[in-house]
Design a protein with these regions (language model features):
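Hydrophobic Val/Ile/Leu positions in short beta-strands of Rossmann-like dinucleotide-binding domains
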Residues: 37-40, 61
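N-terminal charged helix/coil linker that caps or initiates catalytic domains
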Residues: 1-35
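Glycine-rich phosphate-binding loop and adjoining beta1-alpha1-beta2 segment
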Residues: 63-97
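A structured beta-alpha segment of the ubiquitous adenosine-cofactor-binding alpha/beta core
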Residues: 87-123, 129-132
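Hydrophobic/small residue at the entry helix of a nucleotide-binding pocket
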Residues: 43
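Glycine-rich phosphate/adenylate-binding loop
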Residues: 2-9, 118-124, 128-217
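Conserved S-adenosyl-L-methionine
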Residues: 53-58
């Protein structure tokens, strides 16, 4: 029986394939950008996968947590990664998908005291926290202390509500909010993979639209 040959494309082949899908000019822009993802749970891990597949040049991955069995139904981790730092597990998974993406990882909790340092190298910041207070902290900090950076945040993706209620709204010229803006775990009774991934897809797509200069009205 013939063995399976595991052939990784060269970087040139990889970039050429992406350019065929996105156009060379836009792909060059994608590959030159750094996106920070704050929180690597149901939102952040899925955002990271989408952006890595799109050929974003560098991702800054930030999360303090470890992979838990309750994460597996909606987050981009595997059963054999239980107990690993999410930063390490997601790094491994991303490099299997997109071998030439540059990854910077920080296994740390984002706080007011360290956020500016952690995010200063990013062109676009994705807020992907679970906690409402953390969401508010990061949003306010970016808007007040890093007004030159784009922020793509999320609010409302719990339960079995209609997929069509997930939307992207432009709040300011550099602040976008994805989600239904009302559902939460307490009122809806839980999180469903498909709806969380839908919101994450809105976030990732918004990042790509910003880079393509196709802004929401």
């Amino acid at each position: 029986m013939w063995g399976v040959v595991n052939l990784i494309p060269t970087k040139e082949e990889w970039n050429k394939a992406l350019a065929e899908r996105h156009g060379e000019k836009l792909q060059t822009k994608f590959s030159s950008v750094t996106v920070a993802i704050c929180g690597l749970g149901g939102l952040g891990s899925n955002v990271a996968i989408s952006l890595a597949r799109a050929g974003i040049g560098k991702l800054i991955l930030i999360d303090f947590d470890r992979v838990d069995i309750t994460n597996l139904h909606r987050q981009q981790y595997k059963a054999n990664q239980l107990g690993m730092n999410k930063t390490d597990a997601l790094r491994d998974n991303l490099l299997e998908i997109a071998p030439y993406v540059t990854l910077e990882t920080h296994t740390i909790c984002v706080k007011e005291e360290n956020a500016t340092h952690l995010l200063q190298g990013a062109d676009i910041i994705c807020e992907a926290f679970d906690n409402a207070e953390c969401k508010a902290m990061l949003t306010n900090l970016v808007l007040e202390e890093m007004p030159d950076k784009y922020l793509v945040a999320a609010s409302g993706m719990a339960g079995f509500g209609s997929a069509n209620s997930i939307r992207t709204r432009k709040i300011t010229s550099k602040f976008y909010l994805c989600g239904d803006e009302k559902s939460d775990v307490q009122s809806e009774g839980g999180l469903v993979s498909s709806r969380v991934m839908l919101c994450a897809a809105h976030q990732a797509h918004t990042v790509l639209r910003i880079l393509a200069e196709q802004f929401e009205t």
